[in-house]
Amino acid sequence: MSGPAVSVLIVVWNAERSLRRAVDSVLAERDIDLECVVVDDGSTDETPRILAEIAAADPRVIAVPMAANAGVSAARNRGLEVVRGEWLTLLDADDRFRPGGLSELHRAAVTREAGAVVGQQVWSNGRRTWISGLYDRSDIRRPGRKSLVAAPGLVYYASPHGKLFRRSSIAGLTFEGRVLGDQPWVIAALLRAGDGIEVIGDVVYEWIRTAPAGAGPSITTATRASTQHGIDAAGVATGALTRVIAEASTAIADPDGRRIVAAAYVDRLLRSDLGAHLGRALDRGDPTMGELFTAIADFIDAAPAGLLADASRLDADGDSLARDIVAPPLMRWHRVPEPARAAYRRLAAAAVAAQPDLIRHGRNRLDRWALRVALWESGGLRFRIALAALRVSRATSLLSRGFGGLRRRIRPRTRS
């Protein structure tokens, strides 16, 4: 017997509050022949009971229990063994498909003969809905037929959410690890789609993060968790990059095309997966940030020669290594604990060794001078002046960009 048109794979763990909402958003799609495979990764709350009730009420729901909690990647891999659809999409138990979103993905896949379909997603916290700045890129937002080589900005959208993959093209792909485990899988799936990636403008996926009042961790606990997550991400980033490079070598004949994809992924890792956690550690003055500096330095040291320089030429906003990794600790040097400063010096040295023209990526002449002095002098008056100049330069740049955005918003629209 042939399988359904679409398989939706959901992994759940202690999701008693959100499971029904997630599954209901799938089952509401009555225009598609689908199955909803829900893998319970060893839940200890009411999730197993709720899942059993849902599966008993609708034959489209297939419950797959794991013997014990094994992590999201292992649970997803178990789900991949069960799904039968021609097309596959993934949904987190905390999130939901927007009404009609799954139908729009499937319609684009069928009518446009795509290898993969990429829809839009929004973020919601119960009070407002927004689009993350990281995803607000023309390669992601502008509809049309694309490939990762021609539209490397798609690499920034390396989560499995809001996408539809032809299942035959992902044969043999597996998720690995608890951190960054989905990114190489998604990038490999998109690489296998070649120039058959169809981007649609419809918002199909809602990424929901709300917490009950008083249920959140303390600021200190949350900060330490974020820093540790960054350390873990840096520790596995080299392996993730290696997987992407290997898949690109198989999928792309042109060496330049392979480097474009690899460089885009490096830029994404630095800007989002590592830079974001570094920024949070600085915001709160986390005393363990030295470990994060060391982990990022190890990743930079292990990166293939020239790849960081390639990445710096891809981002229109400037070099992510300078902007998101090297400069932020200098701009908030007073928040860097004394024991972490030696680790930062090693990080800065690794960055300069990997990208000798790093200081050229300052936003202006003052910025470049300040960065040069701060990187090569460990203290003294010139160092303190450079730090002050760096802060002034970056603040001026942010103000300029803010006013520019305001002017674009209030500028009268001309009629064609």
Model-derived segments and spans:
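P-loop NTPase catalytic cores that bind/hydrolyze ATP
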Residues: R258-T288
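A broadly tuned preference for mixed-charge, low-complexity surface segments
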Residues: S168-S169, P255-Y265, V326-V336
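Generic structural hydrophobic/aromatic packing signal, biased to beta-strands
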Residues: V117, F165, W207, L241, ...
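Generic alpha-helical structural element
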Residues: D40, R112, S226, G230, ...
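Membrane-interface aromatic/basic loop that binds lipid-linked glycans or pyrophosphate carriers
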Residues: L282-S416
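Nucleotide-sugar donor-binding/catalytic module of glycosyltransferases
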Residues: M1-D254
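C-terminal, non-catalytic tails of nucleotide-sugar-dependent glycosyltransferases
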Residues: D232-A263, A302-S320, D324
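Hydrophobic alpha-helical membrane segments, chiefly transmembrane helices and signal peptide h-regions
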Residues: T89-L90, S272, I296
